[in-house]
């Protein structure tokens, strides 16, 4: 078990991501069944690229719990900004298509319209660049994280 005083921002981010998933899962399942039962229309968006940037703060805002989480972190003396910055940016594309896909998905979530985004589940994002002995070297960007799905 990780003690709060010793937890890194990445460990706190991972724990918070798990709590968020548990928080919305039942509602998501109920809504999905209601959509099916009522034969409501659902938007489906397909894209081979997705460039959403960091999503933690937007997701907390859309769930209506951003202020609650910030207050809780303040009580625990945890720097919320550090945790937000610990989120790995999924670089799953390199241009306009990825940003467009992310904007569509964000709009659906923010407005509450039912929709699903579909794409390829890449193990690695865009490559990372490093300079080694004066030469540029490309390395894989393992965006998946320790849990494989945060």
Predicted regions and their residues:
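A conserved ligand/cofactor-binding region detector
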Residues: 1-150
């Amino acid at each position: 078990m990780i003690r709060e005083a010793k937890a890194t921002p990445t460990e706190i981010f991972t724990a918070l991501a798990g709590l968020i998933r548990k928080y919305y899962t039942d509602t998501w399942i109920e809504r999905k069944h209601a959509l099916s039962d009522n034969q409501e229309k659902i938007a489906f968006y397909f894209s081979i690229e997705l460039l959403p940037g960091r999503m933690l703060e937007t997701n907390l805002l859309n769930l209506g719990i951003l202020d609650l989480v910030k207050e809780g972190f303040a009580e625990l003396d945890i720097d919320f900004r550090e945790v937000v910055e610990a989120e790995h940016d999924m670089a799953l594309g390199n241009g306009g298509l990825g940003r467009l896909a992310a904007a569509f998905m964000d709009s659906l979530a923010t407005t509450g319209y039912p929709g699903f985004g579909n794409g390829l589940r890449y193990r690695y994002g865009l490559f990372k660049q490093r300079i080694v002995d004066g030469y540029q070297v490309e390395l894989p960007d393992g965006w998946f994280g320790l849990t494989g799905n945060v």
